[in-house]
Amino acid sequence: MMEVTAKLRGAAISAQKARLVADLIRGKSVAHALNILNFSNKKAAVLVKKALESAIANAEHNNSLDVDDLKVSTIYVDEGISLKRIMPRAKGRADRITKRTCHITVKVGV
């Protein structure tokens, strides 16, 4: 089975939120997965769609695979780096904010 990979690294969303969307399209055909992502109302859907479209383009141009036969064989979301930020509070105090990122990996295959 031929598999083609695409990675989106450092996506500006937490892995926990991105996994909710990734679970929706795992194992689906590429056309069905794109349809689900187009109508999903989540920020992560835009990022996952970008990675999926990249994987489709890789399969089409690098490996000459037919797009109609492709399905999402594997999709997983790993944690990326966390950016530490400071939120000023009252009386000279400060709280630490962590802006989380993630790495989205999509594999499509025949």
Swiss-Prot record:
Is Transcription tagged as a keyword?
no
Concerning InterPro entries, the annotation shows: Ribosomal_uL22 (IPR001063), Ribosomal_uL22_bac/chlpt-type (IPR005727), Ribosomal_uL22_bac/org-type (IPR047867), Ribosomal_uL22_CS (IPR018260), Ribosomal_uL22_sf (IPR036394)
Ribosomal protein: present as a keyword of the record? Answer: yes
Q: Which residues form a coiled coil?
A: none
For this protein, what is any one GO molecular function term? structural constituent of ribosome
Q: Which keywords are on file for this protein?
A: Ribonucleoprotein, Ribosomal protein, RNA-binding, rRNA-binding
Q: Which Gene Ontology terms of cellular component type are present? A: cytosolic large ribosomal subunit
One GO biological process term is:
translation
**Gene3D superfamilies according to UniProt:** Ribosomal protein L22/L17
- Provide the assembly information: Part of the 50S ribosomal subunit.
Q: Which NCBIfam families match?
A: rplV_bact
> What is this protein's function?
This protein binds specifically to 23S rRNA; its binding is stimulated by other ribosomal proteins, e.g. L4, L17, and L20. It is important during the early stages of 50S assembly. It makes multiple contacts with different domains of the 23S rRNA in the assembled 50S subunit and ribosome. The globular domain of the protein is located near the polypeptide exit tunnel on the outside of the subunit, while an extended beta-hairpin is found that lines the wall of the exit tunnel in the center of the 70S ribosome.
**Similarity annotation:** Belongs to the universal ribosomal protein uL22 family.
Query: What's the protein called, per UniProt?
Result: Large ribosomal subunit protein uL22
Taxonomy of origin reads: Bacteria, Pseudomonadati, Pseudomonadota, Gammaproteobacteria, Moraxellales
What gene name is listed for this protein?
Answer: rplV
